[in-house]
Design a protein with these regions (language model features):
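Catalytic-core "active-site belt" of small-molecule-metabolizing enzymes
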Residues: 2-197, 239, 247-255
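Buried hydrophobic packing segments
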Residues: 39, 160, 203-210
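A short beta-strand-loop-beta hairpin characteristic of the jelly-roll/cupin
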Residues: 112, 208-213
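Short, charged beta-turn/beta-strand-edge "cap" motif at the junction between a beta-strand
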Residues: 228-232, 246-249
Length: 255
């Protein structure tokens, strides 16, 4: 069985993977992303965007890695504000507030690195996002970055708003405060600087990470850039709200 099929089956049936045979573990990030690509086939779904895991020190500690990782957002795992998400087999059981950007032009791999200014010129719109991550590994904090790339960088469910009708381009997103809370009045506060220093820096990292690994990012794709706060513990039945101040808020329900 293809390792991506193992990951997808675990994603769907909730049976966590203890470990993979050594022969199935990739030896490089490029190999890991190449295997990750097969999730589209085994899920019988389409890729509508990308997520970045471990863009904060808290996020890196949470999954046991030293730097960010990229994962694919599947169409059937993408929701709208106020939707009800099935909690199901989610063992990670956290929610994360994130800035997301829609890409306005297809970016093919290049030998040179993109800079932040060039990347931001290609952004079509800013969006608000709540991610409910999960892992297919039982002990996700110890399996290492190559396995976590196979695991789609712990991607699971996302709720993403429409484009923000606000002149956000003039804002310093690194200083923009965010809070996320649930219906049990548990709240975590965050800030854009928690996302690799600035969500725009995180987006630039993602574009270059894909380019260096021979991956095209297509026009219209959404990139959710990573959590601005510590992951908020949640449970089935919660209403979860991420408040981005002047940019608005986004809420979802779970059951």
């Amino acid at each position: 069985m293809h390792v991506a099929e193992l990951i997808w089956n675990s994603w769907e049936n909730g049976q966590k993977i203890i470990s993979l045979p050594k022969k199935l573990i990739p030896s490089s990030r490029k190999e890991a992303y190449k295997i990750q690509e097969n999730l589209e086939k085994f899920s019988n779904d389409i890729i509508v965007g990308w997520k970045i895991a471990a863009t904060s020190k808290e996020g890196q500690k949470h999954i046991g890695v030293g730097g960010p990782l990229a994962g694919r957002i599947l169409h059937n795992k993408l929701y709208k504000p106020e939707d009800t998400l099935i909690f199901g087999h989610n063992k990670m059981a956290v929610a994360e507030p994130e800035f997301a950007f829609k890409i306005g032009k297809t970016l093919k791999p290049t030998k040179t690195l993109y800079n932040l200014e060039d990347v931001m010129k290609l952004v079509e719109s800013l969006h608000l996002s709540i991610e409910l991550p999960d892992s297919r590994f039982k002990n996700f904090a110890t399996v290492g970055e190559f396995n976590l790339i196979l695991d789609n960088a712990c991607a699971h469910q996302f709720a993403i708003s429409q484009g923000i009708d606000y002149p956000w381009q003039s804002l310093d997103l690194s200083k923009h405060k965010v809070k996320i809370y649930n219906s049990a009045n548990l709240q975590h506060d965050g800030i854009g600087a928690n996302v690799l220093g600035d969500p725009r820096i995180a987006l630039t990292w993602l574009v270059n990470e894909l380019s260096q690994n021979d991956i095209t990012i297509y026009k219209g794709m959404i990139v959710s850039t990573g959590t601005c706060s510590m992951p908020l513990p949640i449970k089935s039945g919660d209403k979860i709200t991420a408040d981005f101040g002047d940019l608005g808020s986004i809420s979802i329900n779970t059951k």
